Amino acid sequence: MTVLCTLMAFVMVVAISSLTVDAIPHSHESYWDQQDDIDRDEFLELLSRLSRTVMNRPEMENSKRGLDLGLSRGFSGSQAAKHLMGLAAANYAGGPGRRRRSEQA
């Protein structure tokens, strides 16, 4: 019985390994090509038009909905230090806040 099972398994392995299937040829058409996608001249024209729009409209500079590239009012280091000092003072037992009557006596 084991000889028959071993022989059958060997025949199956040989039959499966003898079948060769060629893969579909790989195509690069679905990849994004950075060189062909955006024309350099068009990109520079877009940037120049955007800068002219911002320069011609001074109210955009102080507007809430102006163009913000993340360079205007960020969270500075001194603000972070003040925040951490406030947290430390709030957690300190003798720090700011309302005093309990039991602590005042």
Swiss-Prot record:
This is Diuretic hormone class 2. The keyword Secreted applies. Belongs to the diuretic hormone class 2 family. Keywords: Amidation, Cleavage on pair of basic residues, Hormone, Secreted, Signal. Regulation of fluid secretion. Stimulates Malpighian tubules fluid secretion. InterPro entries: DH2-like. Residues 24-63, 101-105 form a propeptide. The modification Proline amide is found at P96. GO terms for cellular component: extracellular space. Residues 1-23 form the signal peptide. It comes from the Eukaryota. It is found in: Secreted. GO terms for molecular function: diuretic hormone activity; G protein-coupled receptor binding.
